[in-house]
């Protein structure tokens, strides 16, 4: 079954499946694998490590991929966007900030501007700035976000911004999520946590295994890991991660953590580097309860698309569990 719609047409892809540009996890090999499977892979530009980005673009080879940035961080080093645009990306995704300053350059380079939003107001502002595609992120998503559940927010944005295709993100890990998102007016999905547990993802193997073993209820929204990593995220954003001993110790005691940071930050970095995820963060969304293996990224795309197609053919009938 084909999924020809505005999204697939704009991005010249076969399947309406996008890789979330996860910082330090969505590298070139993962992005390329998703794109070669018929979706669109986005390299995680994150906080703007130029040397890392250069390496990962090289790792993508000749695959047609895009890149995503944390907008407020990109604003502090705008020249990084020029370096990415010189690579002729299929799309650039901006999240968590004002896209207006960057939209003209992205359009001039021939890339599509994808804006991730968490409110209807942000969606309208993004369209006014020139967004070609909106990603509506629900609170179920891993990493940073706000508080609105996806399936309440999604149709609101679809109704408010009919002039652009909308992509659903947050809590989606299989074809049931894709089928449900399409039913609510989205034209595709973006998945992060599901691809975090892909063979090509740059995450530590122990972190991937934690996702496989976790349930959706094992995640929590917090600022604990932003504080210990020294990332000054603007309010009211918080980050969803798997619960572990470190977050349990400091949740609700963020001021104490900040006061003791000099004594704690070094141990956190050491834990991250050695794969101790009782201390280091595993950034994951509530979809982890639907993830039970670590397959190649192409297999994930194929499963999601095939299961959604079975659901669409079956109408209201249930589909087998799993992707």
What are the language-model segments listed below?
Residues 1-165:
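Active-site entrance/lid segments in N-terminal catalytic domains of soluble metabolic enzymes
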Residues 25, 172-173:
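Residue-level detector of alpha-helix initiation sites
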Residues 116, 170-171:
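Conserved acidic functional residues
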Residues 149-167, 173-323:
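Conserved active-site-proximal phosphate/metal-binding subdomains
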């Amino acid at each position: 079954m084909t999924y020809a719609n505005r999204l697939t047409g704009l991005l010249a892809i076969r399947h309406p499946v996008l890789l979330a540009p996860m910082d330090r996890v969505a590298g070139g090999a993962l992005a390329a694998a998703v794109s070669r499977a018929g979706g669109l892979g986005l390299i995680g530009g994150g906080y703007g490590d130029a040397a890392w980005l250069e390496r990962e673009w090289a790792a993508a080879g000749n695959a047609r991929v895009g890149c995503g940035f944390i907008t407020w961080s990109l604003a502090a080093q705008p020249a990084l966007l020029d370096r990415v645009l010189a690579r002729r990306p299929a799309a650039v995704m901006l999240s968590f900030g004002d896209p207006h300053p960057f939209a003209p350059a992205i359009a001039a380079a021939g890339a599509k501007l994808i804006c991730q939003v968490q409110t209807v107001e942000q969606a309208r502002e993004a369209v006014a700035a020139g967004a070609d595609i909106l990603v509506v992120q629900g609170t179920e998503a891993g990493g940073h976000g706000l508080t609105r559940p996806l399936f309440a927010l999604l149709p609101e944005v679809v109704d408010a911004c009919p002039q652009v295709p909308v992509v659903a993100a947050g809590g989606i890990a299989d074809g049931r999520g894709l089928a449900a998102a399409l039913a609510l007016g989205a034209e595709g999905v973006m998945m992060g946590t599901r691809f975090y547990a892909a063979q090509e993802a740059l995450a530590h193997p122990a972190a991937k295994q934690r996702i496989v073993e976790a349930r959706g209820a094992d995640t929590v929204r917090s600022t604990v890991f932003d504080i210990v990593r020294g990332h000054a995220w603007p309010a009211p954003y918080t980050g969803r991660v798997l619960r572990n001993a470190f977050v349990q110790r400091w949740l609700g005691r963020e001021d104490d953590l900040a006061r003791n940071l000099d004594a704690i930050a070094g141990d956190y970095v050491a834990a991250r580097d050695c794969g101790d995820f009782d201390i280091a963060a595993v950034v994951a969304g509530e979809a982890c309860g639907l993830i039970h293996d670590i397959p190649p990224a192409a297999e994930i795309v194929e499963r999601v698309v095939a299961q959604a197609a079975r659901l669409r053919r079956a109408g209201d009938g249930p589909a087998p569990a799993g992707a």
